[in-house]
């Protein structure tokens, strides 16, 4: 996600509307917005169309209407996307969706992260690690597990803007630096 200030404002506005209507609506708005944003992200031609000033707002709205119908978007999200079309912000949909997802996670008390290991962990081990991290954080954690053989062993945990590198590769790097310094 970029530092798009306008996208953050639009996401906050839609989120505020959803908050007034309850958590179920927040989730529904998130799902609908995500479906529309995913279509824009997956179709470079669609993203170019929404960015291109040569296409009129009416032409963009016509394409958007079909997209909203295919995504099964409700009235509020449809109105929101039409507002984005009027303001020339349809190309910002992926950023708006990303920030909306962050707001929704914060509302639900969910932390998202990634755990990188040198080998694929068994389901039982992944569940145990996730449970332990949730216990330590005191919050629900959604973890993506990935494998990177370059770390040699150990784990690298990325949560938000924090990284805990407990990999063998990092430890060997520290040892190498200490040897160079004569420690």
UniProtKB/Swiss-Prot annotation:
A single MF term (Gene Ontology): proton-transporting ATP synthase activity, rotational mechanism
Topological category with respect to the lipid bilayer: Peripheral membrane protein
Cross-referenced InterPro entries: ATP_synth_OSCP/delta_N_sf, ATPase_OSCP/d_CS, ATPase_OSCP/dsu
Signal peptide positions on this chain: none
GO CC terms of this entry: plasma membrane; proton-transporting ATP synthase complex
Main location: membrane
Database matches in Pfam families: OSCP (PF00213)
SUPFAM superfamilies listed in its UniProt record: N-terminal domain of the delta subunit of the F1F0-ATP synthase
Superkingdom per UniProt: Bacteria
Keyword Ion transport: yes
PROSITE patterns documented for this protein: ATPASE_DELTA
Subcellular location: Cell inner membrane
Assembly notes: F-type ATPases have 2 components, F(1) - the catalytic core - and F(0) - the membrane proton channel. F(1) has five subunits: alpha(3), beta(3), gamma(1), delta(1), epsilon(1). F(0) has three main subunits: a(1), b(2) and c(10-14). The alpha and beta chains form an alternating ring which encloses part of the gamma chain. F(1) is attached to F(0) by a central stalk formed by the gamma and epsilon chains, while a peripheral stalk is formed by the delta and b chains.
Family: Belongs to the ATPase delta chain family.
Function: F(1)F(0) ATP synthase produces ATP from ADP in the presence of a proton or sodium gradient. F-type ATPases consist of two structural domains, F(1) containing the extramembraneous catalytic core and F(0) containing the membrane proton channel, linked together by a central stalk and a peripheral stalk. During catalysis, ATP synthesis in the catalytic domain of F(1) is coupled via a rotary mechanism of the central stalk subunits to proton translocation. This protein is part of the stalk that links CF(0) to CF(1). It either transmits conformational changes from CF(0) to CF(1) or is implicated in proton conduction.
The protein, known as: ATP synthase subunit delta
Organism of provenance: Oleidesulfovibrio alaskensis (strain ATCC BAA-1058 / DSM 17464 / G20)
């Amino acid at each position: 996600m970029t530092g798009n200030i306008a996208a953050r404002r639009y996401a906050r506005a839609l989120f505020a509307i959803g908050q007034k209507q309850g958590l179920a609506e927040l989730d529904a708005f998130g799902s609908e917005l995500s479906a529309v944003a995913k279509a824009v992200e997956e179709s470079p031609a669609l993203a170019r169309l929404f960015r291109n000033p040569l296409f009129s707002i009416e032409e963009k709205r016509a394409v958007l209407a079909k997209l909203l119908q295919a995504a099964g978007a409700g009235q509020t999200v449809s109105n929101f996307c039409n507002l984005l079309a009027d303001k020339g912000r349809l190309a910002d949909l992926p950023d708006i969706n990303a920030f909306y997802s962050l707001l929704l996670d914060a509302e639900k008390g969910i932390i998202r992260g990634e755990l990188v290991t040198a080998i694929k962990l068994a389901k039982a081990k992944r569940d145990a690690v996730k449970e332990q991290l949730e216990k330590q954080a005191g919050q629900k954690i959604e973890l993506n597990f990935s494998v990177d053989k370059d770390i040699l062993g150990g784990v690298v945990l990325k949560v938000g803007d924090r990284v805990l590198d407990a990999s063998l590769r990092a430890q060997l790097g520290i040892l190498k630096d200490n040897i160079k310094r004569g420690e």
